[in-house]
């Protein structure tokens, strides 16, 4: 990987979750997360993460405050999703679904089978 904005792995085609959903979930998991860490987790460039965070803030899905040299993010869980077919669902319900899925897919070891 070369350069700060290099993406660790590329993929082609469509995915079930949007990059916006992935970034929002990362921020919800750790409100003090750095853009660099979001980029690595979501396999995006830092520049793409910055644009997505700006989109999410502009649409009212999250906000941030400066804490020294870092940002602290706040997800707005009661905000409804954008697509008309999902207008009855909130950000909080989406994040709960993603968090539950993450727990369900925890790698099993000999101790937790």
Question: Where is each model-derived feature located?
Answer:
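Amphipathic alpha-helical dimerization/coiled-coil segments
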Residues: 1-8, 80-113
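Key DNA-contact positions within bacterial/archaeal DNA-binding proteins
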Residues: 47
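Alpha-helical residues within the helix-turn-helix
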Residues: 37-40, 57-58
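Alpha-helical DNA-recognition elements
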Residues: 51, 55
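A short, conserved structural fragment
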Residues: 57-67
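Central "turn" residue of the DNA-binding helix-turn-helix
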Residues: 31-32, 43
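Short, cationic-aromatic polyanion-contact patches
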Residues: 9-20, 34, 66-89
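Pre-recognition alpha-helix immediately N-terminal to the DNA-recognition helix
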Residues: 21-26
């Amino acid at each position: 990987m070369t350069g700060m904005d290099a993406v660790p792995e590329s993929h082609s085609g469509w995915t079930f979750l949007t990059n916006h959903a992935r970034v929002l979930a990362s921020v919800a998991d750790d409100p003090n997360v750095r853009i660099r860490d979001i980029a690595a987790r979501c396999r995006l460039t830092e520049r793409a993460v910055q644009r997505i965070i700006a989109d999410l803030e502009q649409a009212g899905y999250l906000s941030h405050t400066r804490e020294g040299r870092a940002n602290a993010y706040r997800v707005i869980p009661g905000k409804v999703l954008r697509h008309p077919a999902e207008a009855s669902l909130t950000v909080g319900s989406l994040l709960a679904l993603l968090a539950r899925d993450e727990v369900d897919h925890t790698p099993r070891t000999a101790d937790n089978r």
